[in-house]
Amino acid sequence: MQVFGSSGTRGRVTEELTPDFVLRVAAAAGTVWGADRVALGRDTRLTGPMLANAAASGLASVGADVDRLGIVPTPALQAYADREGVPGVMVTASHNPPAYNGIKLVGADGVELSVERLEAVESALLDDDPAHAAWDRTGTDRTVESARRTYREELLEAVDREAIAAADLTVAIDPGHGAGALTSPEFFRELGCDVRTVNAHPDGHFPGRDPEPVAANLQDLGTLVRATDADVGIAHDGDADRAIFFDEAGSYIEGDATLAALADAVLEAGDTTVSAVNVSQRLVDVADANDAALELTPIGSTRIMTRIRELERAGKRVPVAGEGNGGVIFPDYRINRDGAYTAARFLELIVDRPASEVLEPYDGYANVRRNVEYADEAERATLVETAGEWAHSADGEVTTIDGYRVDFGDAWVLARPSGTEPVVRVYAEAHERDRATDLADRLVETLERAAAGE
């Protein structure tokens, strides 16, 4: 049984993710940590209070006092964990639909647990023998009101506040009713920006849009950018560890292009950057142009962060890393994804020229993403096997770090099972959208026929 996927553990609440399960995961984590205190945060989902209570109970049962941060972005919990030297539990399902929730586990250094540490927690969970404290040694709760404010203050100290303020930028923000609604608008006002918002009230129903910040869900933000003559649009996912952008014309910017621009601004010869197996050719080209190395990992922030730490221990400089979904990591700041920090770093790029001009060198790439759903583990296995057969029969170079990626020279396609949802994700990229669409559609059609038993 694998409990933790590419970004923690998630599921539909009361079906796959129950309060009892959350309690047991928290107790297992507390047993492995052996910590006197643990930080606990959540996003805006309706089931957040229920599951946070379950997590607090599990932690208290093994003797840990619980610092309840309330609704905070995941990077705010990570900053608190790092500052206080305590591990943390974040109740969030990030970009998943409202019926989902989940858990991310954070170490006392503020970094998501490594694969090795997650496996230790998973073993403790499956052993079902938590280190329960005596009745008079169980943990207590305390409410921490200052976590969001302190997080914003630390952000302000970490970016070029003067340059951003001097640029007199108008910023349109769509926090998507998530945790970022309570931090990002105020942060960018404190940076001296004229802030306009949409979907900026916390609401676990996510009435304005789904939490995932993809183009299909962000039409309101594009409209707001155009209506307010904003310099840039910024969108977050449910826990605000990602940032996706619109340019000054209200046009959606691919996350891969943003990652390439941010990397191009900081990479130097001899540096290393890290991304996942679905990396865009944009980042490959940027790394080559800067004489920097690019290392690939299986998909998921945990895998990328683990590799960053390994590289840094080996003496390598990793100034930037991340994925094309808006999850960018600047290890010199923190080894975590932070949507607000990423957005501020992007603002630094547009203080003297428009966003469209900044992104122009990274045009000419088309990305397509599809999902193929499966009903059970048997169907999942069929889809994965079929993807492998398709990949090895194609006229291209096959990579099997995570799923099956086929590089054709002018394009690539990847199929891999999601670590958080019952779907096989299909990614494709080419210089022409028709080529990328054709590759994705051909593979999806093959998978769907296999799932139907054809």
Predicted ranges, named:
Residues 211-296:
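Acidic, glycine-rich loop-and-beta core segments that form the ion-binding/anion-interacting portion
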Residues 36-43, 67, 170-172, 271-277, ...:
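Short glycine-rich phosphate-binding loop at a beta-alpha junction
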Residues 99-224:
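Gly/Ser/Thr-enriched, mixed-charge loops and adjacent short helices
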Residues 1-55, 59-62, 68, 86-87, ...:
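An N-terminal, well-structured beta->alpha segment
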Residues 271-427, 434, 438-454:
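Phosphate-binding and adjacent anionic-ligand microenvironments
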